[in-house]
Regions:
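Mg2+-dependent prenyl diphosphate-binding active-site environment of isoprenoid biosynthetic enzymes
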Residues: 1-167
Length: 167
């Protein structure tokens, strides 16, 4: 029950990244419906996506966590969000046609770990931290979350180039 206010944090972050990603990809639809920037304009969508990134900090600030636990939660979110945006930047660079070569498998997997692995890592690490896990448990669950995110990103990339959307 005490952890309930924190369960929305990964969803806030994920939805913010989806808004921004839709703009960067110039998508028309998300989950079968028009994307935010097509409905309200890029300026409103960028502002909304960015604003959503800060909602987790408000949830933590307003929580009953001790100051040290709040600081650790802020660090988990900040460090992983930086990785997320680095991964997205690399993905944009590769898709822009500016890259001089095809990325290696290792480079691709690192991009996946940064871009999507970091989001799942936030959920796993934050849950372990708020649940009272040890540092080794927090790291182990973070690594597990990152791996889940990598697998998700690989599947998403396959779906983006596949005609068979049921893969």
């Amino acid at each position: 029950k005490d952890a309930l206010p924190f369960t929305v944090i990964p969803e806030f972050i994920h939805n913010g990244t989806l808004i921004v990603d839709d703009i960067e990809d110039n998508s028309d639809l998300r989950r079968g419906k028009p994307v935010l920037h097509k409905l309200f304009g890029v300026d409103i969508a960028v502002n909304a996506g960015n604003a959503i990134y800060f909602l987790p900090y408000v949830a933590i600030r307003d929580s009953k966590l001790p100051a040290e636990a709040k600081s650790k939660a802020y660090d988990i979110i900040s460090s992983q969000m930086l990785k997320c945006h680095l991964g997205q930047a690399i993905d944009i660079y590769w898709h822009s046609g500016q890259a001089e070569r095809i990325p290696t498998e290792e480079e691709y997997l690192q991009m996946c770990a940064n871009k999507s692995g970091s989001l799942a890592c936030i959920a796993a690490k934050l849950g372990a931290h708020i649940g009272g896990g040890t540092e080794s448990q927090i790291e182990a669950l973070g690594n597990f979350g990152e791996t889940v995110g990598v697998v998700f990103q690989i599947q998403d990339d396959i779906l983006n180039i596949s005609e068979n959307q049921s893969i």
